[in-house]
Amino acid sequence: MSSILIAVIAISALALVFGLILGFASIKFKVESDPIVDQIDSILPQTQCGQCGYPGCKPYAEAIANGDTINKCPPGGQATIEKLADLMGVDIPSSAHDEEKSIKKIAFIHEDMCIGCTKCIQACPVDAIVGGTKALHTVIEAECTGCDLCVAPCPTDCIEMIPVNTTPDNWKWDLNTIPVVNLPADKPTKASEL
């Protein structure tokens, strides 16, 4: 047998043994988590932006399960608050309605002032900023959650949060408020009778 074949067989055998050990250990030493925390975490948007005051979505989910308020996630918006209220069986906080009326903002980089330091890229939790070292940076509008975390690290203050104008392209229809009426097919009905 050649030495290469022996080495391949030995490494394959070691990989198989270590894989079996890891598989056994993952079953034997599995840590059970709270299922309500997992459900809450699946509702949150997973931007890990920290606007809620927690270092990520999982710690905020744990805090909600322990009784914290459900309206601290700006990227999730009103839809997330409603889903969390339904899951937790609580009323929607009144401040959540005020936050929904606020205008959504996104980051805008004044490229003539940008020095390409990449500090904003490192701060962005959703990778909405593109650019390279010593190159101009720009924000991908569709990806930006408006978390404002990129503004503080910028040494030249070239990033500002600007309001997003509502257009037909970014309009969010609330389909639950559109009335749906079932009409019988055999009886013609006038629109005024609805």
From Swiss-Prot:
Cofactor binding remark: Binds 3 [4Fe-4S] clusters.
Cofactor(s) this protein cannot do without: [4Fe-4S] cluster
UniProt xrefs under InterPro entries: 4Fe-4S_dom, 4Fe4S_Fe-S-bd, 4Fe4S_Fe_S_CS, Elect_transpt_cplx_RnfB/RsxB, RnfB/RsxB_Proteobac, RnfB_subfamily
Disulfide-bonded cysteines: none
Domain of life: Bacteria
Main location: membrane
UniProt GO MF annotations: 4 iron, 4 sulfur cluster binding; electron transfer activity; metal ion binding
Region (Hydrophobic): 1-26
Domain 4Fe-4S: 32-90
Positions of [4Fe-4S] cluster 3 binding: C124, C144, C147, C150
One GO cellular component term noted in the UniProt record for this chain: plasma membrane
Annotated binding of [4Fe-4S] cluster 1, by residue: C49, C52, C57, C73
Domain 4Fe-4S ferredoxin-type: 105-134, 135-164
Entry EC number(s): 7.-.-.-
Keyword NAD: no
Amino acids binding [4Fe-4S] cluster 2: C114, C117, C120, C154
Biological process terms in GO annotation: electron transport chain
Record Gene3D superfamilies: 3.30.70.20, Electron transport complex subunit B, putative Fe-S cluster
Location(s) in or outside the cell: Cell inner membrane
Keywords: 4Fe-4S, Cell inner membrane, Cell membrane, Electron transport, Iron, Iron-sulfur, Membrane, Metal-binding, Repeat, Translocase, Transport
Family that this chain belongs to: Belongs to the 4Fe4S bacterial-type ferredoxin family. RnfB subfamily.
Function: Part of a membrane-bound complex that couples electron transfer with translocation of ions across the membrane.
Subunit architecture: The complex is composed of six subunits: RnfA, RnfB, RnfC, RnfD, RnfE and RnfG.
PANTHER family: ION-TRANSLOCATING OXIDOREDUCTASE COMPLEX SUBUNIT B, OXIDOREDUCTASE
Protein's name according to its UniProt entry: Ion-translocating oxidoreductase complex subunit B
Protein source organism: Aliivibrio salmonicida (strain LFI1238)
Name of the encoding gene: rnfB
